[in-house]
Amino acid sequence: MSDIADKVKKIVVEHLGVDESKVTPDASFIDDLGADSLDTVELVMAFEEAFSVEIPEDAAEKIATVKDAIDYIEKQKAA
């Protein structure tokens, strides 16, 4: 796992209070990890702060899984 993936996983565990073993790449924040819409907004804000990236609302709406978040952040950091 990349540093970005590890950091995303850590943020998800801290913000949602879920067991780390449940935070898999295909895990949906809402369906699998029990997040609600406010949780997802807070996660996006935490990702923005942790990685010094800006995630516009239209992009944030497409981030539904752990892998979506990792892929988006990796793409932004590479740009």
Swiss-Prot record:
Main location: cytoplasm
Places the protein is found: Cytoplasm
InterPro entries assigned to the protein according to its UniProt record, in alphabetical order: ACP, ACP-like_sf, PP-bd_ACP, Ppantetheine_attach_site
Post-translation changes: 4'-phosphopantetheine is transferred from CoA to a specific serine of apo-ACP by AcpS. This modification is essential for activity because fatty acids are bound in thioester linkage to the sulfhydryl of the prosthetic group.
Record-linked Pfam families: PP-binding (PF00550)
Keywords of the record: Cytoplasm, Fatty acid biosynthesis, Fatty acid metabolism, Lipid biosynthesis, Lipid metabolism, Phosphopantetheine, Phosphoprotein
Family according to the record: Belongs to the acyl carrier protein (ACP) family.
One record GO biological process: lipid A biosynthetic process
Gene Ontology molecular function, alphabetical: acyl binding; acyl carrier activity
Domain Carrier: start-end pairs: 2-77
GO annotations of cellular component type: cytosol; membrane
Sites bearing O-(pantetheine 4'-phosphoryl)serine, chain numbering: 37
Statement: the UniProt record of this protein carries the keyword Lipid biosynthesis: yes
Protein name as it appears in the record: Acyl carrier protein
Function: Carrier of the growing fatty acid chain in fatty acid biosynthesis.
Bilayer-spanning residue ranges: none
